[in-house]
Amino acid sequence: MPLIYMNIMLAFTISLLGMLVYRSHLMSSLLCLEGMMLSLFIMATLMTLNTHFLLANIVPITMLVFAACEAAVGLALLVSISNTYGLDYVQNLNLLQC
């Protein structure tokens, strides 16, 4: 396995571990999720370039669109929660209440 793939998998693993360790704040969870999406995007782009399959070129672009939508929704949720509660602690939020 080439070194670039190992580095990207290491970046994904570190982001996943960060998501598990720093899950108390919503902002840190969103940053770790963005790191995971970025490493998946780079891996999909490299796989597409190596396979030379024309229809596979849409996969990285679709992942990038979903990552942008996820970031926009996550930041809107963060702003809404911080305006309502004054903090971004995940464990203090009970979103099932009216």
Swiss-Prot record:
InterPro entries: NADH_UbQ_OxRdtase_chain4L/K, NUOK/Mnh_C1-like. One of its GO terms (cellular component) is respiratory chain complex I. GO terms for biological process: ATP synthesis coupled electron transport. It is found in: Mitochondrion inner membrane. It is a multi-pass membrane protein. Its EC number is 7.1.1.2. Keywords: Electron transport, Membrane, Mitochondrion, Mitochondrion inner membrane, NAD, Respiratory chain, Translocase, Transmembrane, Transmembrane helix, Transport, Ubiquinone. It catalyses: a ubiquinone + NADH + 5 H(+)(in) = a ubiquinol + NAD(+) + 4 H(+)(out). The chain crosses the membrane at residues 1-21, 29-49, 58-78. One of its GO terms (molecular function) is NADH dehydrogenase (ubiquinone) activity. Its main location: mitochondrion. Core subunit of respiratory chain NADH dehydrogenase (Complex I) which is composed of 45 different subunits. Belongs to the complex I subunit 4L family. Core subunit of the mitochondrial membrane respiratory chain NADH dehydrogenase (Complex I) which catalyzes electron transfer from NADH through the respiratory chain, using ubiquinone as an electron acceptor. Part of the enzyme membrane arm which is embedded in the lipid bilayer and involved in proton translocation. This is NADH-ubiquinone oxidoreductase chain 4L. It comes from Gorilla gorilla gorilla.
